[in-house]
């Protein structure tokens, strides 16, 4: 995420004094709620969906994830790369390529 966007999210939260409500537990709940709203976009069809609604719900998920990263003082690149390293070890290409059972 671009620094300008991160700063905008932080300012939005700060201007409203909402950080006091952003406990890790509350943020995790909010991420889950918004992820389910994203899932709702695909409730009745795997192929037909309203992209503007998908974008809105996906943005909500990302904003709450960004807030959690800040709250826990985590670096998104660092934690994603750590997880990708574990996934690469767990699902080597030669064993997992094209194997539906090993889809992460």
Predicted region positions:
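Flexible "arm" and connector segments at domain edges
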Residues: 1-104
């Amino acid at each position: 995420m671009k620094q300008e966007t991160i700063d905008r999210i932080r300012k939005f939260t700060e201007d409203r004094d909402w950080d006091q409500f952003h406990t890790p537990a509350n943020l995790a709940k909010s991420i889950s709620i918004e992820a389910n709203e994203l899932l709702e976009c695909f409730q009745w069809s795997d192929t037909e969906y309203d992209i503007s609604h998908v974008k809105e719900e996906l943005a909500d998920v990302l904003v709450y994830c960004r807030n959690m990263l800040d709250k826990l003082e985590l670096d998104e690149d660092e934690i994603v790369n750590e997880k990708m390293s574990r996934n690469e070890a767990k699902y080597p290409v030669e064993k997992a390529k094209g194997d539906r059972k090993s889809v992460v």
